[in-house]
């Protein structure tokens, strides 16, 4: 999972950086780049999960810290990242950054490198919500067709002129309609949808959750207490588009769903495994226990479901903290997965900001304050050691969603939700044939 907290230092001896003297033969930019590269090398050599695979490349050999960071990473690593816009990234992860307020899936036209996008969801009150809805098709970006290399432009802040598409049989064609949206800063509450359904003796709560961020734990409290007041017997948790996020938020969510008698505050919830040098040090000193183990926390909204079962909707975009949540819940209650196979990311990333050593203390490097690195530092498992492979989690009930059918999230006829409702009520559901596109986080 990606953690949004800054680890300024776990302890000084492991984070000690080699000071860099200014060299009059190099430009100030070169000196700053070298200093940043030294910081990268120092932290990866200490905390990186695959620390023993880091190549011996000198910090001064690269002028671009992003390039230097990349060449040090293991071939196993698809996730570690670096940014020179620390505030922007942290705001995005906290759900308070600049955004258009939509989630998109992408596809490629047959026999072409040209792509299209389909709206998965929009946040209420967002720029996208004013003009777009789930199922809308985008075929042009700023009056031009677009390829895979252009996809990031659909989420980068600014103003977009989107050429819309329409279905014509099995094909997609331009509709002639153009939509203009401008990004803005907003609070993107990850509790996107809450609904109640009744099926026979079952009162079912449905919650669509798009991102793990403790900024919005209060939204979980509000939603779950409303579910409790309604007397729900069953929960459907929709994580199909949840790419992960804050470990504190996932711990909180687990603590609110696991049956109350088992979710005792301070009881072990999950385990973390670091590289061998870090693991040895952490195990030798109890002050680092929270880096090895995570524990149930107080939530004031535990559902204490009578069924002691939860239904979770999944896809290939169910990633990291979402998978952590599924794994942890499995150790304490029945978990039924509905949808398609999850992504398969069972590692934790920590954020480090540039610092240097001064008089035995670590001091923030103000000249590099805009930089931040997020290396993979540990693997997670539940208390039973699951998951123990690199494969995604396969649902017991496979259902492929169809973004082309125009059915909105939270609608009882939406295929994944409809399947979960049918499983809870014990009724059979006829799966409609439809088209699906592959997506990835």
Describe every region a protein language model picked out.
Residues 16-19:
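C-terminal motif of bacterial Sec signal peptides marking the signal peptidase cleavage site
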Residues 4, 92-95, 152-154, 197-198, ...:
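A general structural signal for short secondary-structure junctions and capping/turn motifs
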Residues 216-227, 232-234, 243-441:
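C-terminal "post-core" interaction segments
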Residues 122, 210-212, 240-242, 313-316:
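Short strand-loop junctions, especially beta-strand C-caps/beta-turns
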Residues 1-8:
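Bacterial N-terminal signal peptides that target proteins for export
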Residues 21-234, 256-259, 431, 435-441:
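Flexible, low-complexity junctional segments that flank or bridge functional domains
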